[in-house]
Amino acid sequence: MSILKCLGVRGNQLCAARNYLKVLGFSSFHTAPNSSIEIQTQDEEVVIALGSNVGDRLHNFKEALKLMRKSGIHITRHASLYETAPAYVTDQPRFLNSAVRADTKLGPHELLAALKRIEKDMGRTDGIRYGPRPIDLDILFYGKFKVRSDILTVPHERIWERPFVMAPLMDLLGTAIDSDTVASWHSFSGHSGGLNALWEKLGGESLIGEEGMYRVMPVANGLLDWSRRTLVMGILNLTPDSFSDGGNFQSVKSAVSQARLMISEGADIIDIGAQSTRPMASRISAEEELGRLIPVLEAVMSIPEVEGKLISVDTFYSEVALEAVRKGAHIINDVSAGKLDASMFKVMAELDVPYVAMHMRGDPSTMQDSENLKYDNVCKDISSELYSRVREAEISGIPAWRIIMDPGIGFSKKTEDNLAALTGIPDIREEISKRSLAISHAPILIGPSRKRFLGEICSRPSAVDRDPATIASVTAGVLCGANIVRVHNVKDNLDAVKLCDAILKQKSSPIKFKQ
């Protein structure tokens, strides 16, 4: 249903109205919900806010998104996920908030009716205004139009006063305006600087972590606020041919012993890999990978020390990812960002676990070929190529709040490229922010541990002698904005990470002067 339908135009008025709207670009109109006729038209882009504070909030979001898709609402972008303190009525549980951009042929009142139907089907009842609810769905924007009726006001009239609405809304935009529709949304703010200026007036990014609002990632039946400290991911290779420790942990007993050691040394995450991704590595089948992985994964998941820790599985096979999550894995770490298995994104969309998308050209056997080592601008090229993979993942149904990005240190890069990527994390975020603020806010994982470029710089041909260089590279990466570090030597790198976090915390704290 089109916007013209809601205007109530008929007969020979139709062409004139269409031409008028084309010239106008966007419009404001007043309409009653029943003043319409049925006509077909192109999709309108909309923004819908989501909130929940009753029951399983994450499940409520997933169910609402599924029902929205079934109702003719094609979701194209997701905001980050926020846990927020309740507003207005404060004696109630904390909320999860987010928002989505979507395309729909539904007219504004049809869209409203569809969302109200979803709310009702999910158990929402008429109760206290601003009170507890399993799901709350609000239309923030509808195309280029302002809508005024007895039951609907668009843009939503309280967008501008609510940080828990503005933060997800800003996530759905980029710092660059990507369409006339987005330009109209900025114009609706009433500020010369658009929505960006309005968000900054409210407090902008300084509000995140303050005022009871936290950007979070759902994982292992909890919510992870990765801004509080840097996480350490310990590497557990089950392969006979990994470049650093191949063959050391092929038995279940030795693998479990190594997992216990890394946990005792302070690892937050254990990343289990059963397929080598070193340069020139030969690929094994999913069946062979599962044969190596599952006995160890089951054994590690059963040890008491794993309580409170996260288990990641390093794989580019969707079949392996599916079985790993069934066995209890909390994260899937894919060095190919979905390029080596066409089913990966579809499977991950159903698994509801965080997904690490890494930048790599080619595959492990070809990534160091000359054609894969040519960059015009390393950080810009990584940003563009990685963002294109993440966008495909998002369109496939993996929400931005489950994405972790990895610039791919040591993969399809020369030594100088690795250094540029390691210290260029702010540039990578900035480039991605032009297209999507949500994706630019995603956690960034780096994995420089014992990589060849460190050996080249420090003249350390043996990988096991590169731990001091690894510590230095981890330090550089964390100080430049990395949120997760993937390392072989947990103990020493954890010390480096703690120092970096202390430096960053002191740097971000306001300076107080004695009177």
UniProtKB/Swiss-Prot annotation:
Instruction: Please verify whether the record's keywords include Phosphoprotein.
Output: no
Describe the reaction catalysed, as an equation: 6-hydroxymethyl-7,8-dihydropterin + ATP = (7,8-dihydropterin-6-yl)methyl diphosphate + AMP + H(+); (7,8-dihydropterin-6-yl)methyl diphosphate + 4-aminobenzoate = 7,8-dihydropteroate + diphosphate
Gene3D superfamilies for the chain? 7,8-Dihydro-6-hydroxymethylpterin-pyrophosphokinase HPPK (3.30.70.560), Dihydropteroate synthase-like (3.20.20.20)
Give the record's pH note: Optimum pH is 9.
- Give GO MF terms, alphabetically: 2-amino-4-hydroxy-6-hydroxymethyldihydropteridine diphosphokinase activity; ATP binding; dihydropteroate synthase activity; kinase activity; magnesium ion binding
The record ties this protein, via InterPro entries, to:
DHP_synth-like, DHP_synth_dom, Dihydropteroate_synth-like_sf, Hppk, Hppk_sf, Pterin-binding_dom
Any single biological process term in GO: folic acid biosynthetic process
**Which cofactors, by name?**
Mg(2+)
The protein's induction, as recorded, is: Not induced by light.
Q: Which CDD domains match?
A: DHPS, HPPK
**Temperature and function: what does the record say?**
Optimum temperature is 50 degrees Celsius.
Spell out the residue ranges making up region: DHPS: 232-515
Q: In which pathway does it act?
A: Cofactor biosynthesis; tetrahydrofolate biosynthesis; 2-amino-4-hydroxy-6-hydroxymethyl-7,8-dihydropteridine diphosphate from 7,8-dihydroneopterin triphosphate: step 4/4; Cofactor biosynthesis; tetrahydrofolate biosynthesis; 7,8-dihydrofolate from 2-amino-4-hydroxy-6-hydroxymethyl-7,8-dihydropteridine diphosphate and 4-aminobenzoate: step 1/2
Q: Which residues bind (7,8-dihydropterin-6-yl)methyl diphosphate?
A: 277, 314, 333, 406, 451, 486-488
Cellular component, GO annotation = mitochondrion
Task: Decide whether keyword DNA damage is in the record.
Answer: no
**Targeting presequence:** 1-28
The record's SUPFAM superfamilies line, in alphabetical order, gives: 6-hydroxymethyl-7,8-dihydropterin pyrophosphokinase, HPPK, Dihydropteroate synthetase-like
- Keywords, comma-separated and alphabetical: ATP-binding, Folate biosynthesis, Kinase, Magnesium, Metal-binding, Mitochondrion, Multifunctional enzyme, Nucleotide-binding, Transferase, Transit peptide
- According to the UniProt record, what class of enzyme is this? transferase
NCBIfam families, per database record: DHPS, folK
Function field: Catalyzes the first two consecutive steps of tetrahydrofolate biosynthesis.
- Give the UniProt family note: In the N-terminal section; belongs to the HPPK family.
Q: What is this protein called?
A: Folate synthesis bifunctional protein, mitochondrial
Question: Could you tell me the gene encoding this protein?
Answer: MitHPPK/DHPS
